[in-house]
Design a protein with these regions (language model features):
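Helix-coil boundary and N-terminal low-complexity module in membrane systems
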Residues: 1-108, 115-235
Length: 235
């Protein structure tokens, strides 16, 4: 019976992990209340997930979240805010084009999907590679092109609640969305970001390895270019 409550028990570890995800979920929603901080809050979740999935890192998950939130508050908020604004403008233009000018629905929806796809990767990229807003805007495209399936999966998990809300408003029935409110509030976002980080872990490790190899090659080239020191003559 004592083994049931042991930290080594797989069931106990699972319950503890679920509890951690619920805590992070509530903190994330609280940090999203000023809407412009959503991107930074997502960066905080990715930082916390990195700690959670690293058995050698014993950093507090809450501390890791706020560290990522603080680090991404400037650059991620700027890049995420700009791309989100563009997404909303594209969504409005698509709505007008479809209902006002009779354009096919897929022509209106495709730019929105691409924009959402792109925006979802910004906090993830910054959480692993601290960089400027311009570097985020540029490098996220390369990540999407190199790993379309993994980044598409993160896009679906990131925007699923918002998509269901839009669909409910469009059909005039948001009962199903509201019925899932306990899941959104307690568990969804923490769990979704857990899988998002798992999706992107391998691509990020490849990028880190490539970067380290490039740095080592550059250092070796610089060392070879240095002239050999001549021995001083002995008097």
């Amino acid at each position: 019976m004592s083994n049931l409550f042991s930290y080594e028990n797989p069931i106990m570890q699972l319950l503890m992990k679920i509890g951690d995800l619920m805590i992070l979920n509530v903190i994330y929603l609280g940090c999203c209340l000023p809407i412009f901080t959503i991107g930074a809050a997502q960066a905080g979740l990715y930082t916390a997930m990195k700690v959670m999935q690293d058995p050698e890192d014993d950093t507090s998950l809450v501390a890791a979240f706020f560290r990522g939130f603080k680090a991404g508050f400037g650059q991620v908020t700027l890049a995420w805010g700009i791309t989100t604004l563009i997404t909303l403008l594209v969504l409005a233009a698509g709505y007008l084009g479809h209902f006002g000018y009779g354009l096919p629905a897929w022509i209106c929806i495709l730019p929105v999907v691409i924009s959402c796809w792109y925006t979802a990767q910004i906090p993830a990229f910054h959480s692993r590679f601290g960089c400027t807003a311009w570097q985020l805007v540029r490098n996220v495209w390369f990540l999407i092109i190199a790993h379309p399936l993994r980044t598409f999966g993160t896009m679906v998990l990131t925007w699923l609640p918002f998509g269901l809300l839009i669909y409910g408003l469009y059909t005039g029935d948001i009962f199903e969305f509201m019925a899932m409110a306990p899941i959104w509030i307690t568990l969804y976002f923490g769990t979704a970001w857990y899988f998002c980080y798992a999706f992107l872990k391998k691509p990020f490790n490849v990028l880190i390895e490539h970067f380290n190899q490039t740095q080592n090659a550059t250092a070796e080239s610089s060392a070879e270019a240095l002239p050999e020191a001549e021995e001083a003559p002995v008097e």
